[in-house]
Amino acid sequence: MLRSLWSGVNGMQAHQIALDIESNNIANVNTTGFKYSRASFVDMLSQVKLIATAPYKNGLAGQNDFSVGLGVGVDATTKIFSQGNIQNTDVKTDLAIQGDGFFIISPDRGITRNFTRDGEFLFDSQGSLVTTGGLVVQGWVRNGSDTGNKGSDTDALKVDNTGPLENIRIDPGMVMPARASNRISMRANLNAGRHADQTAAVFALDSSAKTPSDGINPVYDSGTNLAQVAEDMGSLYNEDGDALLLNENQGIWVSYKSAKMVKDILPSAENSTLELNGVKISFTNDSAVSRTSSLVAAKNAINAVKSQTGIEAYLDGKQLRLENTNELDGDEKLKNIVVTQAGTGAFANFLDGDKDVTAFKYSYTHSISPNADIGQFRTTEDLRALIQHDANIVKDPSLADNYQDSAASIGVTINQYGMFEINNKDNKNVIKENLNIFVSGYSSDSVTNNVLFKNAMKGLNTASLIEGGASASSSKFTHATHATSIDVIDSLGTKHAMRIEFYRSGGAEWNFRVIVPEPGELVGGSAARPNVFEGGRLHFNNDGSLAGMNPPLLQFDPKNGADAPQRINLAFGSSGSFDGLTSVDKISETYAIEQNGYQAGDLMDVRFDSDGVLLGAFSNGRTLALAQVALANFANDAGLQALGGNVFSQTGNSGQALIGAANTGRRGSISGSKLESSNVDLSRSLTNLIVVQRGFQANSKAVTTSDQILNTLLNLKQ
């Protein structure tokens, strides 16, 4: 009888423990990161009366044992580490673990390690990240000397998590020092089409000849100390933005005055012949052999082929006057007056080699060494020099072919508006006649007339270029251009507005210049303009991808005490790719331009990412990884010892803590501005209370029943 009594008592005690556990679960229904527990019931040792026996060979069956249980007990409380709900908060230092893992905290600044799922953290007055109970959160902290201004932007968002754990502490007055720009990257298109959407006047050139040092585009100072650059005429545009597209040998004629020749005509009864400008002219004299009839006949014969020679004949007293105004488009046969074969008969006074050359052909060539002796040009400087040279020779035939510029009375420049300008500046030399300029197109059987080029130069046409009078100017010549700007930072954190200007210099060639504000200087700048770097080169492939560029970097001296020279790499794209600059038939446009420098900044705000990295936002717009919260996981989470205050400690049955970063090694992710709620399910807990209550009541009934039977036994004695 006593066994039943004590079994009931044991049952009541076990259910009392279960009631305590479930009540504790319910009490912590709103405790952050709390994990509920349950009681594990086991039966007590049984009292064996008979053991079980096996069947006998004589046929007697086997028998089960005869044993009586001695009640129930609780051998363990099991913690259930299922995921709690994640709740949003307004606190940036609140953290929640989604998945396995525990935050690592220390009550003694790192000597002892405890663990928690409660991520309700805050910064104390010294900048330490702590729990509400004052335990310091551990992880990895960025080296104090590593301010992120040496590595890449990606490195700035990472913390070295391979070292030993530290207490997470962030200086609330942290300052990020300035980082000098050492790289400019750019994505843009430079228009390769026939029509330029963005143009600018070609660079001004003075009337002083300069010899290119590199055979391409020299940079030199004019009298006004403005940097000058000679440009490829084949890459230029007219003032409407239409590309000239000069092909090899295309060009113009420039006549500086009408060609003239006066000759006596001999009376003759014979046939007369003459070859002018390569065209044969012949006539048979009238039967009357007077000089007058010979003049008229000669004039009529020459004028009959004017469309082939450009020459018109006039009667001037008893002489024949030939004149070519050089106004017709065409080849050499229509220009000047040249006796290409001596005359006979009435033309006997026309000798082989007689000529009056006042019109000059200027033809474009792609060669970097054009032959000036035959009127070839490539750059604006080549054409300017040719026009100036020939204009002075025509005006003053006494000048030597290699005369000095100082001896010239006619100056040709390209003005600030991109126009070729001719000025008959000498008003003292009155014995020299004025010029009469006319521009016409050049064409031949193999070369077409470039009308755009001719029309742009026809602005030079003038009735008379008077000494000391007004100048004559062509239309405006432009180059395709594109410009963009970006602020670069020096080592002191000072901004400098750097402007990059691109201009087309050839079919697939672009040049660029870089300008920084004074007193800053660029290595390679001229003495007059040290803040301007000229001569950058870009070459594109026939698919519009970048083929190459030079130079690949700039050297900048801010002239304000900052480190110098500051080397800035120009990351304009990879060769053969479309990841930077391109040149296709599309408007010129900058899609993106970036540099990697920044000014000094104060720490303004913090936040955590999913890896537990503490990111600091600074007043300079930069973000820097300041620290990373560590996580620990265990082979057996249920083996951890609860210490109260939402804190656990490691035990022999939990296994060693496996420490690492979030999202690695079975460790979960971390959510900022969130907390993990208790995983207690009230409906389950309240149901369990009813079950425990019924169990307790049933066991109490066993006690009262046993008591009643004992009373019955006592009554039997009476």
UniProtKB/Swiss-Prot annotation:
Does Iron-sulfur show up as a keyword for this record?
A: no
CC per GO annotation: bacterial-type flagellum basal body
Under the heading InterPro entries, the entry gives:
Falgellar_hook_FlgE_sf (IPR037058), Flag_bb_rod_N (IPR001444), Flagellar_FlgE/F/G (IPR020013), Flagellin_hook_IN_motif (IPR010810), Flg_bb/hook_C_dom (IPR010930), FlgE/F/G-like (IPR037925), FlgE_D2 (IPR011491), FlgE_epsilon (IPR012835)
Q: Name one GO biological process term.
A: bacterial-type flagellum organization
> Which keywords appear in this protein's UniProt record, sorted alphabetically?
Bacterial flagellum
Q: Source gene?
A: flgE
Q: What is its main location?
A: other
Source species, please?
Answer: Helicobacter pylori (strain J99 / ATCC 700824)
Q: What is this protein called?
A: Flagellar hook protein FlgE
| Top-rank taxon | Bacteria
